[in-house]
Amino acid sequence: DWLELGSEALWAMNEAWIRSGARPPRLWPFVLIGQTIDRKLYDNLNTYTGEDGSDGVVRVASANLNASYVSLKPKPGSRRFDALEVNEVISGPKVAMRVVPGRAHAGKDLGIMRSVRSRRTNDSVDNEITVNAIMRCFLVRTRNQYNRLCAAFDAETEALQSQEQVEESPRFISRRTFVHDIYSQVIFRVRDSQQCELNDFELLLTAKRASPNTLPVGFLKDRQRNRLQRSTLTYYLNHNIMTGNTEIPGVREKSPGCIQLGLEVHAKPNRGLVRFKDAKLQASASILKALLRANETVLV
């Protein structure tokens, strides 16, 4: 239960990390993860083993320690519904995070640890990149060196994700094309005015004209509700589609994405003498920027 997305313990740990500010002296975390799916390990009963934006087990956005916290509160003065406004935006400490090429979570062929061998193989270049990335982490001795490595890892990750976006798989009878987009993870926790959990509610994302119908097609990859903390929802969003993607000839047309993002919360009961009012956060470009972070998780 602890590791389930949106668990109370996981939220507390992540919020504490985000609020921690500067790291202790001479402690520099590093994150290395692949985003390659080992098709031989795909489980037809568990589609998450082939989930985009992951290594087949862990999402890049989950592994990435670069995370943010956003709190919303009711804006005073509204009668028909509670207009929400941003109360707090906190970005966690900057962490060096690198997506390495051709690596999955496990397995002797593509596993990020098990597949690295001393002898030369067909994927020796990917092995060398993985080992070199680890050695570059070991060589860090100062804050300036760490900051430079953070910037280098960011640039290398961006280049790699562009390079690995389209995968032509020879493992199927007919040619199969997989598109590996970048993803963002947003974990929503809903409370009432007394900080009590809400278990019966609807949460809608909105775009221009404050409508959920103006969001781009295919923007939502996955949505999960925590089994124990029923007031917590995790949205897994396609960052490329949300921000606008370029054409992939023969695979996908160009789409403009959205320039604004907002949300609505409809809690139950919403009728009767004692009831909840709807809560709405007006869609805006600033909310889109705050909630949609490439390869990252945002707690809201």
Predicted regions: what they are:
Residues Q194-N213:
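Short, ordered, surface-exposed loop/turn motifs in non-cytosolic proteins
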Residues D1-S169:
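Helical cap/lid subdomain of alpha/beta-hydrolase-fold lipid enzymes
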Residues L160-V179, Q260-V300:
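Extracellular beta-sheet/turn segments enriched in Thr/Pro/Gly and aliphatic residues
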Residues G34-I37, D192-Q194, H266-N270:
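Short, flexible beta-strand-to-coil junctions
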Residues S211-K254:
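Tryptophan-paired
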